[in-house]
Curated annotation (Swiss-Prot):
Organism classification: Eukaryota, Viridiplantae, Streptophyta, Embryophyta, Tracheophyta
Co-factor requirement: thiamine diphosphate
Keywords: Metal-binding, Mitochondrion, Oxidoreductase, Potassium, Pyruvate, Thiamine pyrophosphate, Transit peptide
Name this polypeptide is given: Pyruvate dehydrogenase E1 component subunit beta, mitochondrial
GO CC annotation: mitochondrial matrix
Residues at which thiamine diphosphate binds: E82
Length: 359
Protein backbone atom coordinates (compact mmCIF):
# COMPACT_ATOMS: atom_id res chain seq x y z
CA UNK A 1 0.00 0.00 0.00
CA UNK A 2 2.80 2.42 0.87
CA UNK A 3 4.37 1.92 -2.52
CA UNK A 4 1.09 2.84 -4.13
CA UNK A 5 0.92 5.98 -2.01
CA UNK A 6 4.47 6.93 -2.82
CA UNK A 7 4.05 6.57 -6.57
CA UNK A 8 0.55 7.99 -6.78
CA UNK A 9 0.23 10.58 -9.52
CA UNK A 10 -1.36 13.74 -8.20
CA UNK A 11 -4.47 14.82 -10.03
CA UNK A 12 -4.56 18.40 -11.30
CA UNK A 13 -5.46 20.52 -8.31
CA UNK A 14 -7.42 23.69 -7.96
CA UNK A 15 -5.96 26.08 -5.39
CA UNK A 16 -8.09 25.65 -2.31
CA UNK A 17 -7.72 29.27 -1.35
CA UNK A 18 -9.20 30.61 -4.60
CA UNK A 19 -12.69 29.76 -3.46
CA UNK A 20 -12.21 32.22 -0.64
CA UNK A 21 -10.11 34.78 -2.50
CA UNK A 22 -12.96 37.26 -2.85
CA UNK A 23 -14.18 36.74 0.72
CA UNK A 24 -12.99 38.35 3.92
CA UNK A 25 -14.17 35.59 6.23
CA UNK A 26 -13.21 31.92 6.59
CA UNK A 27 -14.36 29.28 9.05
CA UNK A 28 -11.85 27.24 10.99
CA UNK A 29 -13.23 24.11 9.29
CA UNK A 30 -12.58 25.54 5.82
CA UNK A 31 -9.15 26.75 6.87
CA UNK A 32 -8.15 23.25 7.95
CA UNK A 33 -9.63 21.69 4.82
CA UNK A 34 -7.83 24.09 2.51
CA UNK A 35 -4.53 23.57 4.34
CA UNK A 36 -4.81 19.81 3.86
CA UNK A 37 -5.69 20.28 0.20
CA UNK A 38 -2.79 22.62 -0.54
CA UNK A 39 -0.24 20.38 1.18
CA UNK A 40 -1.56 17.20 -0.47
CA UNK A 41 -1.40 18.90 -3.85
CA UNK A 42 2.14 20.13 -3.25
CA UNK A 43 3.60 16.90 -1.84
CA UNK A 44 2.60 13.40 -2.96
CA UNK A 45 4.02 11.96 0.28
CA UNK A 46 1.24 13.57 2.32
CA UNK A 47 -1.76 11.33 3.01
CA UNK A 48 -4.66 11.22 5.46
CA UNK A 49 -5.92 8.37 7.60
CA UNK A 50 -8.45 7.88 10.36
CA UNK A 51 -12.01 6.92 11.15
CA UNK A 52 -14.52 8.28 8.60
CA UNK A 53 -12.05 10.68 6.95
CA UNK A 54 -12.94 9.40 3.47
CA UNK A 55 -16.44 8.31 2.52
CA UNK A 56 -18.05 10.29 5.34
CA UNK A 57 -15.70 13.24 4.64
CA UNK A 58 -14.64 13.46 8.27
CA UNK A 59 -16.75 13.28 11.40
CA UNK A 60 -16.77 17.10 11.37
CA UNK A 61 -16.35 17.50 7.59
CA UNK A 62 -12.78 18.77 7.82
CA UNK A 63 -11.70 16.34 5.06
CA UNK A 64 -14.65 17.14 2.79
CA UNK A 65 -13.91 16.55 -0.90
CA UNK A 66 -10.43 15.14 -0.40
CA UNK A 67 -11.29 11.48 -1.06
CA UNK A 68 -12.90 12.37 -4.38
CA UNK A 69 -9.94 14.52 -5.33
CA UNK A 70 -7.00 12.37 -4.21
CA UNK A 71 -8.45 8.88 -4.14
CA UNK A 72 -8.53 6.09 -1.53
CA UNK A 73 -4.75 5.57 -1.72
CA UNK A 74 -4.22 8.94 -0.05
CA UNK A 75 -7.38 9.33 2.02
CA UNK A 76 -7.66 6.12 4.03
CA UNK A 77 -10.71 5.13 6.06
CA UNK A 78 -9.62 2.95 8.96
CA UNK A 79 -11.33 0.53 11.34
CA UNK A 80 -12.14 1.71 14.86
CA UNK A 81 -8.70 0.84 16.17
CA UNK A 82 -6.63 3.85 17.15
CA UNK A 83 -3.66 1.73 18.18
CA UNK A 84 -3.69 -0.01 14.81
CA UNK A 85 -3.92 2.91 12.43
CA UNK A 86 -1.63 5.13 14.53
CA UNK A 87 1.03 2.43 14.40
CA UNK A 88 0.62 2.22 10.63
CA UNK A 89 0.97 5.99 10.42
CA UNK A 90 4.17 6.05 12.47
CA UNK A 91 5.59 3.23 10.34
CA UNK A 92 4.75 5.17 7.19
CA UNK A 93 6.56 8.21 8.62
CA UNK A 94 9.62 6.04 9.28
CA UNK A 95 9.40 5.06 5.62
CA UNK A 96 9.55 8.72 4.55
CA UNK A 97 5.88 9.46 3.99
CA UNK A 98 3.97 12.27 5.72
CA UNK A 99 0.81 10.91 7.33
CA UNK A 100 -1.86 13.11 8.87
CA UNK A 101 -3.63 10.92 11.42
CA UNK A 102 -7.05 12.07 12.61
CA UNK A 103 -8.50 11.17 15.99
CA UNK A 104 -12.24 11.69 16.26
CA UNK A 105 -11.37 13.07 19.70
CA UNK A 106 -7.99 13.19 21.41
CA UNK A 107 -9.49 11.21 24.27
CA UNK A 108 -9.20 8.23 21.91
CA UNK A 109 -5.50 8.93 21.37
CA UNK A 110 -4.96 7.22 24.72
CA UNK A 111 -5.57 3.95 22.87
CA UNK A 112 -2.49 4.78 20.76
CA UNK A 113 -0.29 6.44 23.37
CA UNK A 114 2.53 3.92 23.00
CA UNK A 115 2.95 4.71 19.30
CA UNK A 116 2.69 8.47 19.85
CA UNK A 117 5.13 8.70 22.76
CA UNK A 118 7.46 5.71 22.62
CA UNK A 119 7.69 5.49 18.83
CA UNK A 120 6.98 8.89 17.24
CA UNK A 121 8.24 11.25 19.95
CA UNK A 122 11.40 9.40 20.99
CA UNK A 123 12.78 7.91 17.79
CA UNK A 124 14.73 10.94 16.59
CA UNK A 125 16.57 11.27 19.91
CA UNK A 126 17.15 7.54 20.33
CA UNK A 127 18.58 7.30 16.81
CA UNK A 128 20.93 10.26 17.33
CA UNK A 129 18.99 12.24 14.74
CA UNK A 130 19.09 9.56 12.06
CA UNK A 131 15.34 8.88 12.07
CA UNK A 132 12.80 11.60 11.34
CA UNK A 133 9.12 11.04 12.05
CA UNK A 134 7.16 13.59 9.98
CA UNK A 135 3.66 12.81 11.24
CA UNK A 136 0.73 14.97 12.35
CA UNK A 137 -1.81 13.80 14.92
CA UNK A 138 -4.88 16.03 14.68
CA UNK A 139 -8.42 16.09 16.05
CA UNK A 140 -10.75 17.42 18.70
CA UNK A 141 -9.48 18.44 22.11
CA UNK A 142 -11.19 19.73 25.21
CA UNK A 143 -14.70 20.89 25.97
CA UNK A 144 -17.17 20.10 23.19
CA UNK A 145 -20.48 20.85 24.99
CA UNK A 146 -22.47 17.97 26.39
CA UNK A 147 -20.37 14.97 25.41
CA UNK A 148 -19.21 13.88 28.86
CA UNK A 149 -15.90 13.22 30.58
CA UNK A 150 -14.57 10.66 28.08
CA UNK A 151 -14.88 13.07 25.14
CA UNK A 152 -13.95 16.40 26.77
CA UNK A 153 -10.45 16.04 28.22
CA UNK A 154 -7.96 18.78 27.35
CA UNK A 155 -4.62 17.21 26.43
CA UNK A 156 -2.57 20.37 25.92
CA UNK A 157 -0.47 20.02 29.07
CA UNK A 158 -0.41 16.22 28.75
CA UNK A 159 1.31 16.23 25.36
CA UNK A 160 3.08 19.52 26.07
CA UNK A 161 5.18 17.79 28.73
CA UNK A 162 6.68 15.26 26.30
CA UNK A 163 10.08 15.92 24.66
CA UNK A 164 10.12 15.09 20.97
CA UNK A 165 6.63 16.39 20.25
CA UNK A 166 5.49 19.77 19.01
CA UNK A 167 2.03 20.79 20.22
CA UNK A 168 -0.06 23.37 18.37
CA UNK A 169 -3.34 24.93 19.53
CA UNK A 170 -5.06 27.07 16.85
CA UNK A 171 -7.76 29.59 17.61
CA UNK A 172 -8.63 31.44 14.40
CA UNK A 173 -8.86 30.52 10.72
CA UNK A 174 -5.44 32.12 10.23
CA UNK A 175 -4.02 29.96 12.99
CA UNK A 176 -5.64 26.80 11.67
CA UNK A 177 -4.49 27.26 8.09
CA UNK A 178 -0.98 28.50 8.81
CA UNK A 179 -0.16 26.14 11.66
CA UNK A 180 -1.51 22.99 10.00
CA UNK A 181 0.55 23.69 6.88
CA UNK A 182 3.63 24.19 9.08
CA UNK A 183 2.87 20.99 10.99
CA UNK A 184 2.66 18.90 7.82
CA UNK A 185 5.96 20.31 6.56
CA UNK A 186 7.75 19.76 9.88
CA UNK A 187 10.20 16.83 10.11
CA UNK A 188 9.08 15.98 13.66
CA UNK A 189 5.82 14.62 15.10
CA UNK A 190 3.23 17.31 15.75
CA UNK A 191 0.14 17.09 17.95
CA UNK A 192 -2.49 19.44 16.51
CA UNK A 193 -5.27 20.17 19.01
CA UNK A 194 -8.51 21.53 17.55
CA UNK A 195 -11.76 22.54 19.26
CA UNK A 196 -15.14 21.42 17.94
CA UNK A 197 -16.85 24.63 19.03
CA UNK A 198 -14.49 26.66 16.81
CA UNK A 199 -15.03 24.70 13.57
CA UNK A 200 -18.03 26.75 12.47
CA UNK A 201 -16.71 30.11 13.64
CA UNK A 202 -15.72 32.59 10.93
CA UNK A 203 -12.70 34.86 11.20
CA UNK A 204 -11.39 37.65 8.98
CA UNK A 205 -8.51 36.56 6.75
CA UNK A 206 -6.14 38.60 4.63
CA UNK A 207 -4.99 37.93 1.08
CA UNK A 208 -1.69 36.76 2.54
CA UNK A 209 -3.43 34.09 4.63
CA UNK A 210 -5.36 32.88 1.59
CA UNK A 211 -2.23 32.47 -0.50
CA UNK A 212 -1.06 28.89 -1.00
CA UNK A 213 2.44 29.77 0.23
CA UNK A 214 1.19 31.05 3.60
CA UNK A 215 2.29 29.29 6.78
CA UNK A 216 2.99 30.23 10.39
CA UNK A 217 6.20 29.53 12.32
CA UNK A 218 5.90 26.92 15.05
CA UNK A 219 6.69 28.22 18.53
CA UNK A 220 5.71 31.84 17.92
CA UNK A 221 2.82 33.42 19.83
CA UNK A 222 0.66 36.27 18.52
CA UNK A 223 -0.29 39.40 20.41
CA UNK A 224 -3.98 39.63 19.54
CA UNK A 225 -4.54 42.85 21.45
CA UNK A 226 -1.97 45.24 22.88
CA UNK A 227 -2.30 46.58 26.40
CA UNK A 228 -0.32 48.13 29.22
CA UNK A 229 -1.93 47.07 32.51
CA UNK A 230 -2.14 43.26 32.52
CA UNK A 231 -1.04 40.36 30.29
CA UNK A 232 -3.58 37.61 29.55
CA UNK A 233 -2.32 34.41 27.90
CA UNK A 234 -4.73 31.94 26.31
CA UNK A 235 -5.00 29.31 23.58
CA UNK A 236 -7.63 27.67 21.40
CA UNK A 237 -11.21 28.59 22.38
CA UNK A 238 -10.02 30.55 25.41
CA UNK A 239 -8.45 33.23 23.19
CA UNK A 240 -11.92 34.41 22.23
CA UNK A 241 -12.91 34.50 25.89
CA UNK A 242 -9.80 36.51 26.74
CA UNK A 243 -10.54 39.05 24.01
CA UNK A 244 -14.11 39.49 25.25
CA UNK A 245 -12.78 39.96 28.77
CA UNK A 246 -10.35 42.59 27.49
CA UNK A 247 -13.24 44.54 25.96
CA UNK A 248 -15.07 44.54 29.29
CA UNK A 249 -11.93 45.54 31.17
CA UNK A 250 -11.32 48.43 28.79
CA UNK A 251 -14.66 49.93 29.79
CA UNK A 252 -13.46 49.85 33.39
CA UNK A 253 -10.18 51.55 32.61
CA UNK A 254 -7.96 48.46 32.45
CA UNK A 255 -5.83 47.94 29.34
CA UNK A 256 -5.28 44.20 28.82
CA UNK A 257 -2.74 42.66 26.46
CA UNK A 258 -3.99 39.34 25.06
CA UNK A 259 -1.48 36.74 23.85
CA UNK A 260 -2.65 33.87 21.63
CA UNK A 261 -0.08 31.18 22.43
CA UNK A 262 -0.64 29.18 19.20
CA UNK A 263 2.05 26.75 20.33
CA UNK A 264 2.28 24.90 23.66
CA UNK A 265 5.50 23.11 22.82
CA UNK A 266 7.68 24.94 22.03
CA UNK A 267 6.32 27.74 24.22
CA UNK A 268 7.09 31.32 23.21
CA UNK A 269 8.62 32.38 26.50
CA UNK A 270 10.29 35.53 25.12
CA UNK A 271 6.98 37.03 23.93
CA UNK A 272 5.25 36.20 27.21
CA UNK A 273 8.03 37.61 29.39
CA UNK A 274 8.40 40.74 27.27
CA UNK A 275 4.71 41.43 27.72
CA UNK A 276 4.81 40.87 31.48
CA UNK A 277 7.81 43.16 31.81
CA UNK A 278 5.66 45.84 30.18
CA UNK A 279 2.37 45.26 32.03
CA UNK A 280 3.83 43.94 35.32
CA UNK A 281 0.88 41.55 35.77
CA UNK A 282 -0.11 38.13 34.45
CA UNK A 283 -3.32 36.12 34.06
CA UNK A 284 -3.15 32.71 32.37
CA UNK A 285 -6.26 31.09 30.90
CA UNK A 286 -6.89 27.49 29.87
CA UNK A 287 -9.77 25.02 30.03
CA UNK A 288 -7.67 22.11 31.28
CA UNK A 289 -7.19 20.86 34.82
CA UNK A 290 -5.52 23.34 37.21
CA UNK A 291 -2.74 21.04 38.47
CA UNK A 292 0.38 20.74 36.30
CA UNK A 293 -1.26 22.80 33.56
CA UNK A 294 -0.04 25.08 30.78
CA UNK A 295 -0.73 28.08 33.01
CA UNK A 296 1.49 26.65 35.72
CA UNK A 297 4.36 26.37 33.24
CA UNK A 298 3.83 29.94 32.05
CA UNK A 299 3.75 31.26 35.61
CA UNK A 300 6.94 29.37 36.40
CA UNK A 301 8.66 30.89 33.38
CA UNK A 302 7.64 34.39 34.42
CA UNK A 303 8.70 33.83 38.05
CA UNK A 304 12.09 32.54 36.87
CA UNK A 305 12.75 35.21 34.24
CA UNK A 306 10.69 38.28 35.17
CA UNK A 307 9.94 38.09 38.90
CA UNK A 308 11.37 41.53 39.58
CA UNK A 309 8.90 43.10 37.16
CA UNK A 310 5.75 41.73 38.82
CA UNK A 311 3.54 44.15 40.75
CA UNK A 312 0.97 41.53 41.71
CA UNK A 313 0.54 37.82 42.29
CA UNK A 314 0.16 35.85 39.06
CA UNK A 315 -3.38 34.59 38.42
CA UNK A 316 -4.31 31.22 36.87
CA UNK A 317 -7.71 30.48 35.33
CA UNK A 318 -8.53 26.87 34.42
CA UNK A 319 -11.16 24.18 34.57
CA UNK A 320 -12.27 22.61 37.83
CA UNK A 321 -10.26 19.68 39.16
CA UNK A 322 -12.93 17.11 38.26
CA UNK A 323 -13.79 15.04 35.16
CA UNK A 324 -16.16 16.86 32.82
CA UNK A 325 -19.82 16.39 33.84
CA UNK A 326 -22.36 15.37 31.21
CA UNK A 327 -25.23 17.60 32.38
CA UNK A 328 -25.09 21.05 30.83
CA UNK A 329 -25.76 22.94 34.06
CA UNK A 330 -22.90 21.12 35.78
CA UNK A 331 -20.60 21.44 32.77
CA UNK A 332 -20.93 25.20 32.94
CA UNK A 333 -19.70 25.15 36.52
CA UNK A 334 -16.38 23.47 35.70
CA UNK A 335 -15.21 25.39 32.61
CA UNK A 336 -13.78 28.94 32.60
CA UNK A 337 -15.92 31.88 31.53
CA UNK A 338 -15.32 35.46 30.47
CA UNK A 339 -16.35 36.78 33.87
CA UNK A 340 -13.69 34.60 35.54
CA UNK A 341 -11.01 36.27 33.44
CA UNK A 342 -12.37 39.73 34.19
CA UNK A 343 -12.32 39.09 37.95
CA UNK A 344 -8.78 37.69 37.84
CA UNK A 345 -7.50 40.67 35.84
CA UNK A 346 -9.13 43.10 38.26
CA UNK A 347 -7.54 41.29 41.21
CA UNK A 348 -4.15 41.52 39.50
CA UNK A 349 -4.71 45.24 38.99
CA UNK A 350 -5.75 45.63 42.64
CA UNK A 351 -9.27 46.64 41.72
CA UNK A 352 -12.04 45.90 44.18
CA UNK A 353 -13.66 42.50 43.63
CA UNK A 354 -16.32 41.32 46.13
CA UNK A 355 -15.21 38.24 48.03
CA UNK A 356 -18.30 36.31 46.92
CA UNK A 357 -17.50 37.03 43.28
CA UNK A 358 -13.84 36.15 43.69
CA UNK A 359 -14.57 32.81 45.35
Amino acid sequence: MLGVIRNKTIRPSFSAFRFFSSAKQMTVRDALNSALDVEMSADSKVFLMGEEVGEYQGAYKVTKGLLEKYGPERVLDTPITEAGFTGIGVGAAYYGLKPVVEFMTFNFSMQAIDHIINSAAKSNYMSAGQISVPIVFRGLNGDAAGVGAQHSHCYASWYGSCPGLKVLVPHSAEDARGLLKAAIRDPDPVVFLENELLYGESFPVSAEVLDSSFWLPIGKAKIEREGKDVTITAFSKMVGFALKAAEILEKEGISAEVINLRSIRPLDRPTINASVRKTNRLVTVEEGFPQHGVGAEICTSVIEESFGYLDATVERIGGADVPMPYAGNLERLVVPHVEDIVRAAKRACHRSVPLAAAA
